[in-house]
């Protein structure tokens, strides 16, 4: 999971700089956003072609759905928010493991709900308060990406098994002052100090929670478990920016970031309680 996180961080380094370069070179045109969008679309197509050509389907033919219609009804359970939060599609787990997944999934959802919203509002804040240009915002994300890559490459992949929740707690606790500092920052130096704390949380929380969840279930269940887990993250990322932007434009950046930062106390408390309730390792499934 740390290697996946490093790959994500590298994309976080290169992507914003490419977008900023496009925006600056095309700023004289009224539709400067079209070329970056087409470039991203082309990369996605190339990625799909690469996957098709280099990866083989792991599901044996005899276990695949016989028709699209027969699998469509089952797919609906993977987009129902309530079924996702309760991990209902996951079958044949012990009650203890199922409850642990539900708690971890809910914590992950809350964390990304608050995180994605404040992350989305960051461009508004830097433009309104510091008059950052597109290139300056790209450089800002470049620095954050470098910090994330260093944290994941030098620290996260060395975390011993069983310590994921402890590191995750540290990451969420760190992001509380991070967003508060960003919200009240009046100089670029203060902003970047908050961003470095933000980078630590960004580089630790999601990889550690994903690693923790991946320990549950048997070989035939892990795909479903991780798929539901990632779907919860996507749902949070869909709702978070809307909620955060509403507060940002209604009450201002200071209130938005202070309240948003304090909201992270909720997943900290829930994760701490879950840590106390867990004892031993997940059940081994075959």
Residue ranges of predicted features:
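Glycine-rich segments within core transmembrane alpha-helices of 12-TM secondary carriers
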Residues: 1-23, 44, 232-240
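Multi-pass alpha-helical transporter architecture, strongest
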Residues: 45-55, 182, 239, 253, ...
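Pair of pore-lining "gating" transmembrane helices in MFS-fold secondary transporters
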Residues: 97-122, 196, 200
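A membrane-interface helix-boundary motif in multi-pass transporters
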Residues: 23-41, 244-268
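Short amphipathic helix-loop junctions that connect adjacent transmembrane helices
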Residues: 120-136
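Helix-to-loop junctions at the C-terminal end of transmembrane segments
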Residues: 23, 150-164, 248-249
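Juxtamembrane intracellular "pre-TM" segments in multi-pass secondary transporters
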Residues: 58-106, 128-129
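C-terminal transmembrane helical hairpin of 12-TM major facilitator-type secondary transporters
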Residues: 163-209
């Amino acid at each position: 999971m740390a290697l996946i996180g490093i790959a994500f961080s590298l994309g976080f380094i290169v992507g914003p700089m490419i977008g900023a370069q496009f925006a600056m070179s095309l700023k004289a045109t009224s539709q400067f956003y079209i070329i970056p969008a087409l470039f991203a679309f082309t990369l996605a197509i190339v990625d799909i072609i690469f996957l098709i050509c280099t990866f083989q389907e792991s599901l044996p033919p005899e276990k695949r759905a016989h028709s699209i219609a027969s699998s469509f009804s089952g797919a609906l359970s993977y987009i129902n928010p309530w079924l996702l939060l309760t991990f209902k599609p996951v079958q044949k787990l012990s009650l203890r493991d199922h409850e642990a997944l539900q708690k971890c999934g809910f914590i992950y959802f809350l964390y990304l709900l608050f995180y994605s919203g404040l992350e989305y509002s960051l461009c508004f804040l830097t433009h309104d308060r510091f008059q950052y240009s597109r290139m300056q915002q790209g450089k800002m994300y470049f620095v954050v990406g470098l910090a994330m890559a260093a944290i994941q490459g030098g620290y996260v992949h060395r975390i011993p098994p069983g310590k994921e929740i402890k590191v995750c707690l540290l990451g969420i606790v760190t992001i509380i002052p991070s967003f508060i500092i960003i919200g009240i920052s009046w100089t670029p130096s203060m902003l970047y100090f908050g961003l470095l704390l933000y980078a630590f949380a960004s580089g630790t929380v999601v990889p550690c929670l994903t690693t923790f969840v991946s320990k549950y279930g048997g070989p035939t269940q892990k795909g479903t478990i991780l798929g539901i887990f990632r779907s919860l993250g996507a749902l949070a990322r869909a709702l978070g920016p809307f909620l955060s932007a509403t507060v940002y434009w209604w009450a201002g950046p200071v209130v938005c970031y202070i309240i948003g930062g304090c909201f992270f106390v909720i997943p900290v408390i829930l994760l701490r309680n879950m840590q106390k309730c867990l004892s031993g390792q997940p059940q081994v499934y075959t």
